[in-house]
């Protein structure tokens, strides 16, 4: 058998564990993970390379009904991805019925010829019988190429899933150099790490009304330290106070937690300078969304 290479999309309803699975497979923190919905905004590619194969994983936003221009962008990215990849991993939870959200996703799967593996995540949370029942229900809705039950957070059956993925990929050369784990810009990864901490620490409404813009990343010439300056933009003035917190304690907590992840990412000491500003209505500002990379030319993909 020759060398295999291909693109694999992770799709599913919000918070079924797509980003957690991607991070488990790569054993690197590339995709933002949080218990709150719609945490993944960009198609973060994670790249797994061995002597025998290279798999490029595309982590899509959860498919949902759009409520803003940003949401519309997220949906378009997810739909576009289904058409472009070599394989789709459709992730579900073992305690879910085939509700309106799943039917919506399955309808989109039926519109493309891409093979699909059904991945049942979080099997550590329910009895085996319930997992089997869930698989049976979903197999009645769609003809999957294969089915794998996993626990991404406990690393259960991850190697089995990788074997199934590789078996369905086409033969071909590598797309990326061996030491690549993602093709995302450095500033985007840093911004997503900071945003993840806001998702963990802040109230439900606030994190989805913010974006992070990394102004600069500089390595000091005289010391093994990286200086990062970043701005947190929120939609409402009231949110600004929540993000900063009493006596700046919340912003300090966000910064300290992000700094630890950034130091692990860079392998050296990081000095993180965070600022908070208000920018009303940014999620419906088409010009700003394009600047942030949330732009899509629909004609290109029709």
From Swiss-Prot:
It comes from the Bacteria. The keyword Membrane applies. Residues 59-62 are annotated as: G3. One of its GO terms (biological process) is ribosomal small subunit assembly. Pfam families: KH_2 (PF07650), MMR_HSR1 (PF01926). Gene3D superfamilies: 3.30.300.20, P-loop containing nucleotide triphosphate hydrolases (3.40.50.300). It is found in: Cytoplasm; Cell membrane. Coiled coil: none annotated. CDD domains: Era, KH-II_Era. PROSITE patterns: G_ERA (PS51713), KH_TYPE_2 (PS50823). Residues 12-19 are annotated as: G1. Keywords: Cell membrane, Cytoplasm, GTP-binding, Membrane, Nucleotide-binding, Ribosome biogenesis, RNA-binding, rRNA-binding. GO terms for cellular component: cytosol; plasma membrane. Residues 4-171 form the Era-type G domain. Signal peptide: none annotated. GTP binds at residues 12-19, 59-63, 121-124. Residues 202-280 form the KH type-2 domain. An essential GTPase that binds both GDP and GTP, with rapid nucleotide exchange. Plays a role in 16S rRNA processing and 30S ribosomal subunit biogenesis and possibly also in cell cycle regulation and energy metabolism. HAMAP family: GTPase_Era. Monomer. This is GTPase Era. It comes from Thermoanaerobacter pseudethanolicus (strain ATCC 33223 / 39E) (Clostridium thermohydrosulfuricum).
């Amino acid at each position: 058998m020759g060398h295999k290479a291909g693109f694999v999309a992770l799709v599913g309803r919000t918070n079924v564990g797509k980003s957690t699975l991607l991070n488990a497979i790569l054993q690197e923190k590339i995709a933002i993970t949080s218990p709150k919905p719609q945490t993944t905004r960009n198609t973060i590619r994670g790249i797994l390379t061995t002597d025998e194969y290279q798999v490029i994983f595309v982590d899509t936003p959860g498919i949902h009904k759009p409520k803003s221009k940003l949401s519309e962008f997220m949906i378009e990215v997810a739909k576009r991805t289904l058409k472009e990849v070599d394989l789709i991993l459709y992730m579900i939870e073992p305690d879910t019925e085939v509700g309106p959200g799943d039917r919506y996703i399955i309808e989109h799967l039926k519109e493309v010829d891409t093979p699909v593996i059904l991945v049942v995540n979080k099997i550590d949370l329910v009895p085996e019988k319930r997992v089997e029942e869930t698989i049976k229900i979903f197999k009645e809705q769609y003809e999957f190429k294969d089915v794998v039950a996993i626990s991404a957070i406990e690393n259960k059956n991850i190697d089995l899933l990788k074997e199934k993925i590789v078996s369905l990929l086409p033969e071909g050369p590598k797309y990326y150099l061996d030491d690549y784990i993602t093709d995302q810009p450095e500033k985007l990864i840093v911004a997503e790490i900071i945003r993840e901490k806001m998702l963990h620490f802040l109230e439900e409404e606030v994190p989805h009304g913010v974006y992070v813009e990394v102004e600069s990343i500089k390595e000091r010439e005289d010391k093994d330290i990286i200086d990062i300056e970043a701005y947190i933009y929120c939609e409402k003035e009231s949110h600004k106070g929540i993000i900063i917190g009493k006596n700046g304690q919340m912003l300090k907590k966000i910064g300290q937690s992000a700094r630890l992840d950034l130091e692990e990412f860079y392998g050296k000491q990081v000095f993180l300078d965070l600022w908070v500003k208000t920018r009303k209505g940014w999620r419906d500002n088409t010009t700003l969304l394009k600047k942030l990379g949330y732009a899509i030319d629909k004609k290109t993909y029709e």
